[in-house]
Amino acid sequence: MLSGGHIMSLREPPMDRRELLALFGAIGAAAPLAADDHEGKKEPHASPLAGPHAHFCGIHMAKKDPKFQLVTQHYCTADTQAGHDDFFQCILFDRTGPGAKLLGVEYIVSDAVYRKLPEEEKKYWHAHTYEVLGGGLIAPGMTPDDEMKFMKTILTTWGKAWHTWPDPSTAVPIGEPLLIWSLMADGQVDEKVVAARDREFKCSTAKIRAARAEAIGFEVPNVAPPKDLNALGRQWTNDGDDKPKKK
């Protein structure tokens, strides 16, 4: 189950894996690939994109340049055959619908898995606590109740994201891949980016934030942007004991 192992209980327990999979619609599911080129193959191969997926929308920023921010669409599989239940993998796009540009990939692990990573590896992973509690992360295909359950589940997860198309305004991917970081405190987001996202999905980040604060029961995190590419992420506080504050 994707839940933070080192902290608190939420006002309602997060979903177990069965409940989580039940929420995932077959968004972006692909038809099985035919195997006509192999006469001995009677059954078609299944596409890696087939099966239950979740779509959620967040605001990404570049770790090396926190002012570089853009709305990013995530299409994530919850069953990767990775050998454990604490791993998702996501394809990232600049928009929904046909013609969207493939920006990159993101991998998501539980807090328990993150804690076991080598120290040198952790600099690539960003926290999701502020994205959830600040209202920046939404799941457009879910009902409000299901979205809340989902957000409680991913609250303390960590993501490793690279944008291999660093500037979606270019006709083709130009430049080196961008290591992506997360917004982690009030005042860090570009309000124009938030406003554009809210208009597109007809939602209110402020109302989402208020509802999640009430349901989850924690203050929003307050973590400064990374000083450099080697900085490690934190989930709740800028220094000291990295634990949440109850409302």
Regions found by a protein language model. Give the residues of each.
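N-terminal secretory signal peptides
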Residues: 1-19, 23-29, 39-93
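Boundary at the C-terminal end of the N-terminal hydrophobic targeting segment
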Residues: 34-35
